[in-house]
């Protein structure tokens, strides 16, 4: 396993895994609960999120001060199909009209957030879609950072039109 081989030269690296696939929200929560740092940064594993933007997200969070719980990436130059971009645009408009949290793109996996703020959020599946609104509800501010989207390098999306729409509505 690649992670195990890296641990020999990186003693700080830990390998945490679930016994079975549990979904994005559960994976992030497990990682955050095991994190030792005060700030946690996330990105999707399909290659669309460029890790080069993590320092900018961290800086934005740090400069905004302790009352800011989340620096949320917002994709520019999306590399998805026109249909997928249309779905996201509609979903984000509906979501934004209801939640009024000022976030135009909750689907971006690039985020930096205060561990303490994240752990104060109520946990539910699909939490990652609502992090900005939940941070605001808990009294934190949210800052947004434009990040450049890249074409997907690996895997396939687990989110389609119907499950994205219905899960979002029910949540």
Please give the residue ranges for each predicted region.
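Flexible glycine/serine/alanine-rich "lid" or loop that lines and gates the nucleotide-sugar donor pocket
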Residues: 137
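Conserved alpha/beta core of the MobA/IspD/sugar-nucleotide pyrophosphorylase nucleotidyltransferase superfamily
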Residues: 140-147
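A short, conserved beta-strand element in the Rossmann-like catalytic core
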Residues: 48
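Carbohydrate-interacting regions of secretory-pathway proteins
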Residues: 1
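Acceptor/aglycone-binding surface of glycosyltransferases and processive sugar-polymer synthases
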Residues: 4, 12-34, 39-42, 51-129, ...
